[in-house]
A protein has these predicted regions:
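Extended, folded cores of ATP/NTP-driven motor/assembly subunits in large transport
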Residues: 2-418
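Walker A/P-loop NTP-binding active-site region of P-loop NTPases
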Residues: 462-515
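P-loop (Walker A) phosphate-binding loop of NTP-binding proteins
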Residues: 459
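A short helix-turn-beta junction within AAA+ P-loop NTPase domains corresponding to the substrate/partner-engaging
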Residues: 500-504, 714-727
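P-loop NTPase motor domains
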Residues: 65, 72-91, 98, 102, ...
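Hydrophobic anchor at the beta1->P-loop junction of P-loop NTPases
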Residues: 456
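Conserved P-loop NTPase
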Residues: 742-797
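Structural recognition of the conserved hydrophobic beta-strand(s) that form the central parallel beta-sheet
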Residues: 483-486, 629, 666, 692, ...
Length: 801
């Protein structure tokens, strides 16, 4: 693998670049192989690289946080913490920030969203949904992988001497990232080699195949596994790696001030790109001495100019503007170093563009240069330093480019390495739209959260019920989870029926019955299922009696005494026909002597023998279908809250059964605020909310009435136990309440202000992502999921026809 290397041409630099430009070393030997061009000596299994004879480095990968979407106060905190992070590095440590955008094999992403046909009656909608996912993936940039690294190097006589110090620096870096709320981890040797392999093969799809055992078996070196077929540095402005064209450039910072969006703009490009920021701290005393020396030089030049002015007969205060500018800049830097906790850094910002053709390369470089110009900077090609630029773009923390710019801590920190978080998980992940900032697909697995409980919040017409149905559809196609829906508005039956589920219509005229007294032997953690069931019966009776402040202790005691008597027959012989009903509890209460028992029985009478006796029957519907929808739309006002509470208890029964089968249960509660509005049902609902997680339940509350929801005393418990919130458009008053409750920044709040249908904010653990989800209205699935009255009417007409 032979390469061509022409002579080098000097490179020009700015005022401060001239101060710190190193003389170029003469090249003693002509490198004849690709491997010898790669500038490191050894790469250890543990990730420690011997770069030069006495130079060793390690690399840490770090992930993004939501900097661009943060509140100004939070932005300032992040920025100040990032300044502290930079100030950690003393003059003995070189470090390099690497930002790599490279195209990935789309097949890896397709595997995550793949839905295989099952050759059943659902294949038409299943394949339709799969096609929709592929179309959404194509809209984004998920095929472009963005990774971020920090590499640090120190000088040492041997690896034994270097290792403990590198590990100590690594620990400090990880702790500093932790302060910033940034996830990070150190790379091993294979992972570091893979980065270099991908840098040298950016336009290729072949995967990196390497293990340290391969070296022992083949006798090759690590460089043999990462090197391209050839390097060609014939031109002074670009080069070739194998069949790939490349160009290395540096950022010439001309602007007096930069915005913290400058790096984000470069990284937002949808092309292969490597941005490397090499940073070398200058010893504080040396930096101050150096700047004082430059000020002295400038003052001397100023005096000479003034003498010249006097001799020429014009005002001695008139001096060259550059001299005044440089003098002011130098004095400001000195003040920063002496009194503002600033350090001085020597910084080199490099860009590596690659492409399959020369035309594509020129286009990519032109686009990159355009962004630089937008921020009053210039992107200059490294004339006859292309090899040094390429090799300095490798994460080795060894800068071979002799062009450096002196910057203070604050000026260096303006290259904030954080933009917006992405969420694309493997496993049982579900689709939640596209990232509104990056346009990348959002795939997340709620079951990976500490608390998978969730809320879907939005104004009427914002798409909250549609979003719930889309998740239900996704769950049905990609998991084995059971799905239960509490449907107070009769909106879910078209989808449930289309997926082969069971719709249970509960009303005063319906023949579908569910028994609120149903219990199974696994109803609680311990061997006493009646303990947990008692909580439900008490909540039920409180709701029936309208006891806003709860029942009296005597009343609770009477019920608690009756329950073992009522359930005795079933617990002795657990057959379905032995299951008690509300009528059995009513009869038992009538037999008690206390007046409290008679009071409770009287309250129950209308639900046992009167016009509201719909819940005084044995369950007569099968509840073992994978998808069950409890349609309680036709229940009157008196029964709706009661019905929702009873449905919730039926769900708990199902969850306890599924737990033994190691199966998850998804539970969707529309009009969730109704359960939290009454103290009686709110307390029980929160208890269920807390217990669901360890029993394999994944509940989702859906509501448009944010004020009613937040008015509940129990809402704090709901939010604390909900790590997933899908927030759509919000009314003005609700936005302010939610902003305070969830600490949402004004910029983030704009995504739920007058937003279109299917747009909003996704809260996944500590991650907040703005999303958009435009669903194709021509799909059959759309007609099954829509809740728009006119479109639902068309579905009914079509079904009846």
């Amino acid at each position: 693998m032979v390469k061509s290397e022409p002579k080098k041409k000097p490179q020009s630099g700015g005022f401060f670049q001239k101060f710190f430009r190193k003389p170029e070393k003469s090249q003693k030997e002509q490198r004849l192989t690709v491997q010898r061009s790669i500038p490191y000596l050894e790469m250890g299994r543990d990730g420690i690289c011997r770069v030069e004879e006495h130079l060793y480095s390690k690399t840490v990968r770090f992930y993004d946080i939501n900097y661009q979407l943060a509140q100004n106060e939070d932005k300032n905190t992040i920025f100040e913490s990032w300044c502290d992070f930079l100030n950690y590095f003393d003059a003995s440590i070189r470090f390099q920030l690497s930002f790599i955008n490279h195209k990935s094999d789309m097949s890896e992403y397709n595997k995550v969203i793949q839905i295989e046909p099952q050759h059943d009656q659902f294949d038409d909608v299943r394949m339709e949904y799969a096609q929709m996912l592929r179309q959404q993936l194509a809209k984004g940039n998920n095929g472009l992988v963005r990774t971020k690294y920090i590499t640090f190097s120190i000088e040492a006589k041997s690896v034994r001497e270097a290792k403990p110090r590198l590990e100590r620096i690594e620990t400090d870096i990880l702790n500093n990232f932790k302060v910033l709320g940034v996830k990070a981890y150190p790379l091993n040797g294979v992972e570091r080699l893979q980065i270099m392999y991908e840098t040298f093969h950016q336009e290729e799809q072949q995967k990196f195949d390497f293990s340290y055992d391969s070296i022992l078996q083949s006798g090759m070196t690590t460089k043999d596994f990462i090197a391209p077929t050839s390097f060609l540095f014939k031109s002074g402005k670009d080069f070739m790696m194998g069949d790939t064209y490349g160009a290395a450039s540096y950022l010439n910072i001309l602007a007096p001030e930069l915005t913290d969006k400058v790096l984000a703009e470069f990284l937002d490009m949808d092309k292969n790109l490597v941005v490397s920021i090499h940073v070398q701290s200058v010893d504080q005393l040396k930096a101050i001495k150096l700047i004082k020396g430059k000020i002295t030089d400038l003052d001397r030049m100023k005096i000479e100019e003034q003498k010249k002015a006097v001799r020429s007969g014009y005002d001695m205060e008139i001096i060259p503007s550059d001299l005044a500018t440089y003098g002011g800049e130098a004095k400001k830097i000195l003040d920063d170093l002496q009194s503002r906790n600033e350090r001085m850094f020597l910084v080199t910002v490099l860009f590596l563009n690659t492409a399959k053709t020369k035309q594509e390369l020129d286009s990519a470089v032109f686009q990159t240069a355009g962004i630089a110009q937008k921020f009053n900077c210039t992107l200059n090609r490294l004339d006859y330093l292309q090899e040094q630029g390429l090799m300095s773009s490798l994460p080795l923390a060894n800068n071979l480019v002799p062009i450096k710019r002196a910057l203070t801590t604050t000026s260096t920190a303006i290259f904030v390495p954080f933009t917006t978080q992405e969420l694309f998980m493997e496993g049982d992940s579900l689709y939640y739209g596209l990232n509104a900032v990056s346009n990348n697909m959002i795939m997340a697995d709620r079951k990976q959260l500490k608390n998978p409980n969730g809320l879907i919040l939005g104004t009427p017409g914002s798409g909250k019920s549609f979003s719930a149905k889309r998740e239900i559809t996704n769950v049905f196609f990609t998991t084995t989870d059971d799905i239960i829906v509490a449907d107070p508005e009769g909106e879910y039956y078209p989808l449930v029926e289309a997926l082969g589920g069971q719709v249970i219509h509960i009303s005063s005229t319906s023949k579908d019955y569910i028994n609120p007294m149903d219990i199974n032997l696994n109803y609680a953690d311990d061997d006493n299922p009646l303990g947990m069931k008692s909580d439900f019966i008490l909540s039920l009776c409180e709701l029936i009696m309208g006891a806003r402040d709860g029942m009296e202790p005597e009343e609770k005691s009477v019920i608690d005494r009756c329950l073992p008597l009522v359930y005795q027959k079933y617990l002795n012989d657990p057959k379905p026909e032995n299951m008690p009903t509300l009528g059995d509890l009513y009869d038992c209460l009538r037999e008690q002597k206390e007046r409290q028992a008679q009071r409770i029985a009287t309250a129950l009478e209308i639900y046992v023998n009167g016009s509201l006796r719909v819940f005084n029957h044995q369950t007569n519907v099968e509840l073992d279908n994978r998808i069950i929808c409890f349609d309680i739309k036709e229940l009157g006002k008196q029964l709706k809250k009661l019905g929702m509470l009873i449905v919730q208890d039926q769900v708990w029964n199902r969850v306890t059964i599924n737990r033994n089968s190691k199966k998850n249960t998804r539970y969707y509660i529309d009009e969730f605020h109704l359960l939290l509005k009454e103290e009686q049902t709110a307390a029980y609902s929160v208890e269920i909310w807390k217990r669901f997680r360890k029993w394999g339940g994944v509940p989702t509350g859906i509501t448009q009435n944010i004020k009613d929801l937040l008015a509940s005393r129990e809402i704090e418990n709901i939010f604390e136990n909900s790590d997933f919130i899908y927030m759509l458009n919000q009314a003005s008053g609700d936005r302010q309440i939610l902003a305070k409750q969830l600490n949402i920044s004004p910029f983030q709040l704009s995504y739920v202000t007058n937003s279109n249908e299917g747009e909003g904010l996704l809260f996944y653990g500590n991650t907040i992502i703005p999303f958009k989800d435009k669903f194709d209205t021509s799909l059959k699935l759309y007609s099954l999921m829509t809740t728009k009255p006119m479109e639902m009417g068309k579905y009914k007409e079509k079904k009846e026809a």
